[in-house]
Amino acid sequence: MDMVDRTSRRGYRDWFVQRITALLSGIYAVFVIVFLLVHHPISYPQWHALFSHLIMKIFTLIVIFSILWHAWIGMWTIFTDYVKNKPIRLALETLVCLLLVGYFVWAIEFLWIAR
């Protein structure tokens, strides 16, 4: 019985995290859409100025991290539900994890290092 409780808590946590990450993504999308509508037609200097602010870089990085976390929970759930062969599931999970980490590193490079 104890095992069922731990599983249900993890399921609830995953459900909750997906709702929070979706909310963050939605807030970010609304902000960007409003910015685009207010500054129509937008120029490159305006776009660059928006993403040059420290707060926007931090917010963008948080949203990217939350999207990747959201994706990880979704892919983990799909693999757990549909891939019954454990070595194949582990290989797929490892591949997805490496890709998501790579995407996050790429986002950091794009936001903070690239000029």
UniProtKB/Swiss-Prot annotation:
Q: In which pathway does it act?
A: Carbohydrate metabolism; tricarboxylic acid cycle
Which annotated residues bind heme?
A: H70
| Cofactor detail note | The heme is bound between the two transmembrane subunits.
What terms describe the molecular function in GO for this protein?
electron transfer activity; heme binding; metal ion binding
Q: Which residues bind a ubiquinone?
A: Y82
Q: Which cysteines are joined by disulfide bonds?
A: none
Query: Required cofactors, per record?
Result: heme
Keywords in alphabetical order: Cell inner membrane, Cell membrane, Electron transport, Heme, Iron, Membrane, Metal-binding, Transmembrane, Transmembrane helix, Transport, Tricarboxylic acid cycle
**Entry keyword annotation includes Cell inner membrane:** yes
Q: Which residues cross the membrane?
A: 15-35, 58-79, 90-113
Q: Which segments does the topology annotation call Periplasmic?
A: 36-57
One annotated Gene Ontology cellular component of this protein = plasma membrane
Report the membrane topology from the UniProt record: Multi-pass membrane protein
Designated name of the protein: Succinate dehydrogenase hydrophobic membrane anchor subunit
